[in-house]
């Protein structure tokens, strides 16, 4: 399989492939970040616990160009609270959503606790490929398939993320320009990261990557 940069020509329908590769990272001390990727709070929680290492994207209503693009190799995880529903999650993670929903959703602030690096980006375009990834995500198969069926002529981007815990949570004001169904947000405030620690060790993370890629019939163990 060739490894192509974001925006590369789409492969024949039905063939999963790698479109971007970002170097792995270890425990490190970083300064600041102003780029964030929106995701349901319950999914961010699963990423933070190592229950999941992937996100799926095609785009949001307010996405620039209406299509999702992998614009940044690393970013803050921006937890969102709208549209989360128990029936869109597997039973194993419905209690976690119930816990999240019992807490008042912040309206005027955003708290960042996790930072992520894209390890690889895969593209898929078939329902059986989405179904094969089912063991690796917390959503129902029906919800994951709905991501695929939206704009069916475009492939679904599957981002494999190495997630890091920030040294301490950072809370910033929520601004009107952050609202809307878009994936990427430029945070006005420079968010200090401090020392970041991976939520999964190197061997455990690579094992999870191999499991995801193996489910799609891709070569494992090397990039």
Predicted regions and their residues:
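Short, Lys/Arg-enriched N-terminal segments with co-localized hydrophobic residues
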Residues: 13-27
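Structured alpha/beta reader/binder surfaces that contact nucleic acids or chromatin modification marks
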Residues: 29-223
């Amino acid at each position: 399989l060739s490894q192509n940069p974001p925006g590369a020509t789409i492969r024949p329908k039905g063939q999963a492939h790698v479109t971007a590769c970002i170097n792995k990272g270890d425990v490190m001390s970083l300064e600041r970040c102003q780029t964030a990727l929106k995701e349901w709070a319950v999914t961010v929680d699963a990423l933070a616990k190592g229950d999941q290492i992937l996100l799926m994207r095609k785009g949001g209503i307010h996405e620039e160009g209406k299509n999702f693009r992998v614009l940044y190799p690393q970013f803050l995880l921006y937890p969102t609270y709208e549209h989360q529903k128990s029936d869109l999650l597997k039973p194993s993670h419905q209690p976690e959503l119930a816990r999240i929903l019992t807490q008042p959703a912040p309206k005027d602030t955003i708290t960042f606790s996790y930072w992520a690096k894209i390890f690889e980006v895969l593209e898929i375009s078939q329902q059986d490929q989405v179904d094969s990834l089912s063991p690796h995500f917390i959503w129902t198969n029906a919800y994951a398939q709905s991501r695929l069926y939206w704009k069916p002529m475009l492939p679904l981007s599957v981002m494999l993320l190495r997630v890091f815990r920030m040294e301490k949570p950072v809370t910033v004001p929520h601004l009107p320009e952050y609202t809307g169904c878009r994936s990427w947000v430029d945070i006005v405030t420079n968010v200090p990261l401090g020392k970041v620690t991976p939520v999964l060790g190197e061997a455990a993370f690579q094992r999870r990557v191999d499991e995801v890629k193996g489910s799609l019939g891709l070569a494992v163990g090397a990039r």
